[in-house]
Amino acid sequence: MASLGVILFFVIASLIHGKPIHSERKAAKIPLEGSNLGYKKPNNIYGSRLSQGMRYPPSMMQLYQTLILGNDTDLSILEYPVLQESDAVLSLIAKSCVVVGNRWTLSFDMSSISSSNELKLAELRIRLPSFERSQDVTVEIYHTKEGQENLFMGSFKTNPSVAMGSSWKIFNLTRMLQYYLHQGEPFTNVEYIEVKNMHERAKPHVIKRGVRAEVEEGLQRNKDNTPASSFPTERVVLVVFTRDKPTASHFGSPSLIHTVESSKYVMSENTVRVTDTRRPRRNQKTKNTIVMNTIPSRSVGKTLCRRVDMIVDFEKIEWGDRIVYPKRFNAYRCEGACPIPLNETFKPTNHAYIKSLVKLYDQEKVECSSCVPVKMSPLSMLLYEDGEVVLKHHEDMIVDECGCN
């Protein structure tokens, strides 16, 4: 992984341009309209083909690079613990940005924010012009979906010019989104959210200013007929950190399954997830070792269980349009025969060792143990999901050690 990280660093570094743009989630009572409440298989077995030229925020590439290289110092005070708890990061570019006087109306398609996940952190990141004058503004947040009415999520007050320095400003919207996911209604508490510069990235705090009796109506409500203006949507990004809720499935986290179901290749029903089994330490370890060593292992006439290379090239398995990075990686695999009886070299469970002894004295009674992964590590992937770029952390993707079980 270390060498892979170094290689990816130079590949990624050459593609990053401009300044980077830089969530506990519970089940929603009333989800967002059009939200992803569960994976639905597309009619086309390939899913929706994604354009090779689809844009993705440079910040997502930078975050992926930081994760691969393990450079925790590049993370903010708030991002560091959140990343440890999250397995997906979603970056949503605004659909529209309308400014009417001191009122900003920002719209995002939040369909990708699934109520089946835990919301860990939500940050609104805005790049303001350097000449922006200092004034208090009211920011309204809407969920918008093509062909549907805009849904008001909530609003807050702030003065974006207070934090001098970086043109990128950060606002913590975690509470607003969590409130909607919990209550199924707009966040009507008008609060003052302190702005932070991108380079500070310290944890912003919220100062309550009071409760508004009525929710503002309309995307472009303008009582004083102040001329409306707008600024580029790519300067407004909503970054959401999430975590999949545990399921009862023996396959473990469903995130990877959701990703691959739209591929040409579908996971077999016979696929079995091998978990990391650990043999408990006990005082009889010396005795067990003596027993194992005094019974000679039979020659199986084959190469013994070991780890070998297995290069996964996403282009060759037709995932190239979906995976941004890495385009290929070494997942490794286990192959070879298991000796009879087993010894500590092959990291057997107690059951596997006993079974190998039974096999030694009664060939027909049990089958041979299999060479399988006994220790695995995760892989972070930058990929397209529902038209958005997502950073996902998939467990059990790379074989670290093989053994007989």
Curated annotation (Swiss-Prot):
Residues modified by glycosylation: N71, N172, N343
Signal peptide start-end: 1-18
Expression triggers: By dorsal mesoderm-inducing signals including activin and other nodal-related proteins.
Highest rank taxon of the organism: Eukaryota
SMART domains reported in the protein's UniProt record: TGFB (SM00204)
PROSITE patterns for this protein: TGF_BETA_1, TGF_BETA_2
Molecular functions per Gene Ontology: cytokine activity; growth factor activity; growth factor binding; morphogen activity
Distribution of this protein across tissues and organs: First localized to the vegetal region of the blastula. Just prior to gastrulation (stage 10), this expression disappears and instead becomes localized to the dorsal marginal zone, with enrichment in the organizer.
Principal location class: secreted
Pfam families: TGF_beta, TGFb_propeptide
Disulfide bonds: C305-C371, C334-C402, C338-C404
Family note: Belongs to the TGF-beta family.
Function: Cooperation and regulatory loops of multiple nodals are essential for mesendoderm patterning in early embryos. Essential for mesoderm formation and axial patterning during embryonic development. Activates the activin-like signaling pathway to induce dorsal and ventral mesoderm in animal cap ectoderm. In addition, also dorsalizes ventral marginal zone (VMZ) tissues during gastrulation. Induces muscle actin. Appears to act as both a short-range and long-range morphogen. The unprocessed protein inhibits bmp- and wnt-signaling.
Subunit relationships: Homodimer; disulfide-linked. Forms heterodimers with the TGF-beta family member derriere. Interacts with tsku; enhances nodal2 activity.
Protein name: Nodal homolog 2-A
Protein's organism: Xenopus laevis (African clawed frog)
Underlying gene: nodal2-a
